[in-house]
């Protein structure tokens, strides 16, 4: 019973860390990364579809993205979707592929991106803390229902706290890495 509660809390914390990694991968840090375009949706036969499901997205150089659609007819739609997105990128097409040159980030834009990264990290820290709170509530309920002794619950709560501290530390490391990547000129 207690092991299940601990396992469930840890799984939720792992999901929070993975979610943060995905979110931060979509933040532009001056270098081309195909993950930048993951949230760009293209109207494909009336259905919003992610770019990476309509084309091959590659990064042959540090500041260049190349999008090679499987269907050439969708090329103009992909261009429109990229222009409409809030990424601030300008695509150029030669009829077969779309090239996007990633501009150098200004100091102001870098500090904005760092703020966004910190905000996202805090959202995921809150998710980890919520997982801890839920686990502690379940542990207290199991003590109240006489399913576990007070000592067992205390030990389990200490384990939950250690796990929480560990995942918060992981989030902080991920954030520090992303901040360094953003501020790198």
Curated annotation (Swiss-Prot):
Q: Where is this region: Disordered?
A: 135-159
Localization (cell): Cytoplasm
Keywords per UniProt:
Cytoplasm, Protein biosynthesis
Q: Which GO terms describe its cellular component?
A: cytoplasm
Q: Name one GO biological process term.
A: translational termination
What is an example of a GO molecular function annotated in this UniProt entry? ribosomal large subunit binding
Family statement: Belongs to the RRF family.
Q: Which HAMAP family does the record match to this protein? A: RRF
Known function: Responsible for the release of ribosomes from messenger RNA at the termination of protein biosynthesis. May increase the efficiency of translation by recycling ribosomes from one round of translation to another.
PANTHER family cross-referenced by the UniProt entry: MITOCHONDRIAL RIBOSOME RECYCLING FACTOR PSEUDO 1, RIBOSOME RECYCLING FACTOR
The record ties this protein, via NCBIfam families, to:
frr (TIGR00496)
Kindly provide the name given to this protein in its UniProt entry: Ribosome-recycling factor
Biological source species: Moorella thermoacetica (strain ATCC 39073 / JCM 9320)
Lineage from the top down? Bacteria, Bacillati, Bacillota, Clostridia, Moorellales
């Amino acid at each position: 019973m207690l092991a299940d509660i601990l396992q469930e809390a840890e799984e939720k914390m792992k999901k929070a860390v993975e979610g943060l990694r995905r979110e931060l991968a979509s933040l532009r840090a001056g270098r081309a990364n195909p993950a930048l375009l993951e949230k760009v949706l293209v109207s494909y036969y009336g259905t919003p579809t992610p770019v990476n499901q309509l084309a091959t997205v590659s990064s042959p150089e540090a500041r260049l993205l190349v999008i090679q659609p499987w269907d050439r007819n969708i090329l103009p739609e992909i261009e429109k979707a990229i222009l409409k997105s809030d990424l601030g990128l300008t695509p150029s097409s030669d009829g077969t592929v779309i090239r996007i040159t990633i501009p150098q980030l200004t100091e102001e834009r870098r500090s904005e991106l760092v703020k966004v990264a910190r905000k996202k990290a805090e959202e995921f820290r809150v998710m980890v803390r919520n997982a801890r709170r839920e686990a502690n509530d379940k542990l207290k309920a199991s003590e109240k229902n006489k399913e576990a002794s007070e000592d067992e619950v205390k030990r389990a709560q200490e384990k939950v706290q250690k796990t929480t501290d560990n995942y918060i530390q992981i989030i902080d490391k991920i954030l520090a890495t992303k901040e360094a990547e953003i501020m790198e000129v």
